Amino acid sequence: MFKLNHELIPKSLNLYTVSVMSRSKEKLIEAAITYLNSEGADKMSVNKLVDLANVGYGTFYNHFASIEEIQIEALNKTVRDMLINFKLDVRNETDHVYVLYLALLRGINLLANTPSIHWLLKDVQMVIQVFKEVSQPNMESNYLNAVKAKQIKNTEIEDLINFKNSRHYMQWAAIGAVEQVVNGEFTEKEAFEKLAKNVTVVDIPDKQRDAVIARILKETHPWEIKDNDGKQIPSNPN
């Protein structure tokens, strides 16, 4: 049986190549997302996925080495789709610092509202890795744009290294915020505000940071409504 050598073909090519083989892979990933959202990860099996995707058993192993691998691909696609929509939402925004903070709220919103959140919280390292691979390049681009636009003062392009290093800590802290939302301790915006004021997203004066946060808290975003079945989450009155 022919087996695809994943080492020879980039992941991006696997995802977007228009062919029968890539379509089968897409169907399997969609099936995995559907299953994870409805059943969680514990009972996922190859048999169940190929039935949902309506593909042959061997097709699974042409694309994935294990169930764990397709779980990562499923989360990868979910985050990538979110990022595409997020970039469209802010395409006309000129305040790049605002975009960096808004992305933090969007990440909390995405995870807190996904039906898969409980199994995702069991594998936080996987979540961190996916966000690092998918969203980090976009956040670095926004950071550089903010520096070039002088929206981050007294900063040079070389400080991007420090930003990269701090993002890892921020991602772990964001997972803690998601857990607080899931446990009912805070609303998404309350968790976001607490996190954004206590962990450095970017090195800017508190006054500038607080103004950006206040703007975000006052706004209502399309994905807030969509992800909460049409119910808006009230901003933190403080």
State the predicted function of each range.
Residues 22-30, 42-43, 62-87, 105:
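An amphipathic alpha-helix adjacent to DNA-recognition modules
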Residues 105-130, 144, 179:
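Amphipathic alpha-helical segments used for helix-helix packing
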Residues 87, 127-178:
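Amphipathic alpha-helical packing segments from all-alpha helical-bundle domains
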Residues 1-48, 52:
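Basic, helix-initiating cap at the start of DNA-binding domains
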Residues 45, 117-122, 155-156, 160, ...:
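Short, hydrophobic secondary-structure boundary micro-motifs
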Residues 73, 87-114:
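Hydrophobic alpha-helical connector segments
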Residues 1-11, 148-149, 179, 183-238:
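C-terminal peripheral helix-coil segments that are non-catalytic and often amphipathic
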Residues 53-64:
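Short hydrophobic/aromatic patch on the recognition helix
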